[in-house]
Amino acid sequence: MTNIRKTHPLMKIINDAFIDLPTPSNISSWWNFGSLLGLCLIMQILTGLFLAMHYTPDTTTAFSSITHICRDVNYGWIIRYLHANGASMFFICLYAHMGRGLYYGSHAFQETWNIGVILLFTVMATAFVGYVLPWGQMSFWGATVITNLLSAIPYVGNTLVEWIWGGFSVDKATLTRFFAFHFILPFIILALAIVHLLFLHETGSNNPTGIPSDMDKIPFHPYYTIKDILGALLLILALLMLTLFAPDLLGDPDNYTPANPLSTPAHIKPEWYFLFAYAILRSIPNKLGGVLALLLSILILAFIPMLHTSKQRSMMFRPFSQFLFWMLVADLLTLTWIGGQPVEHPYVIVGQFASILYFLLILVLMPVASLIENKLMKW
């Protein structure tokens, strides 16, 4: 008798995706982040659902409802902090996952990569609208500053901003619609993640060498299920350490002050995971130019497959490209640091240099290094 998991219409899908899936035998721990992202997403949806049961999306009560969750709801404080720090964990996993894809040439799977870029945009949008919900000072001013960027669009800009606001400033209508977006977007992310996986399973996983591994596949279960469980335990450990020992480490103290349209915080800045893009935005002394640079800093990922000039897929055997990759990582860390600093003398120029280097590395230096490596290999 054939096993039910191979015949039942629903179980067959699960079986083909997580049990009998042929997987390369040599994928490293960098391949763990996909499953960790799935775990983060489920965790965020569940904690978010429980928070939504007690939250009120209204300018007069939003801030108080967060206080109510933390003080009066059973274990509300841990749900709230798991959700807030879970977002940070989500982005850590996301950036590691993308870095892995860039390093090992996963962008060769173009559909999977493109869905991934769309997923990144959706996750960033979700995190942004979610940050507005507590209705603290940084929530309010962050929403004002970022939505205002759309006014840089010629001709329709101002109309567009007021349409998004639902009025002439960030107010009740804005908060209500942002809550609606924040509720629906994670389910869109979930659907996109399934499509992402669907396209990945059409081709099979890449591996560190970048060489086809059809002749050396092993079943996903038990080998990688156990490996994923280890990764999940480490992620949960890190999240619990952060949530229970330093819940406000990554947050902004300004957000513990209720939103006040009459008082601007000294330094308006987004959460840490957006600081690199914020630094690029600020480094251009022109509104439209800054907005375009900001958009392009993320959208550039969609062009990575076209910028791949090497005859090899992975960077595993390409020392020049490896050096430039780690230079890009260092550059992004520099941009993240600059994004959190005030707009003053040393920071401005460092941010401008780092922004130029970011685009230069991706658009010029890495493709040229790949061509040089091809020549050295006499290809």
From Swiss-Prot:
Which PROSITE patterns does the record match to this protein? CYTB_CTER (PS51003), CYTB_NTER (PS51002)
Give an example GO cellular component term for this record.
respiratory chain complex III
One GO BP annotation of this record: mitochondrial electron transport, ubiquinol to cytochrome c
One Pfam family recorded for the sequence: Cytochrome_B
Cofactor binding mode, per the note? Binds 2 heme b groups non-covalently.
Write down the membrane topology: Multi-pass membrane protein
CC cofactor: heme b
Record flagged with keyword Transport: yes
Principal subcellular localization: mitochondrion
UniProt GO MF annotations: metal ion binding; ubiquinol-cytochrome-c reductase activity
Q: Which domain of life is it from?
A: Eukaryota
Per UniProt, which keywords does this protein have? Electron transport, Heme, Iron, Membrane, Metal-binding, Mitochondrion, Mitochondrion inner membrane, Respiratory chain, Transmembrane, Transmembrane helix, Transport, Ubiquinone
Note on file? Heme 1 (or BL or b562) is low-potential and absorbs at about 562 nm, and heme 2 (or BH or b566) is high-potential and absorbs at about 566 nm.
Quaternary structure (record)? The cytochrome bc1 complex contains 11 subunits: 3 respiratory subunits (MT-CYB, CYC1 and UQCRFS1), 2 core proteins (UQCRC1 and UQCRC2) and 6 low-molecular weight proteins (UQCRH/QCR6, UQCRB/QCR7, UQCRQ/QCR8, UQCR10/QCR9, UQCR11/QCR10 and a cleavage product of UQCRFS1). This cytochrome bc1 complex then forms a dimer.
Give the protein name, as stated in the record: Cytochrome b
UniProt organism field: Balaena mysticetus
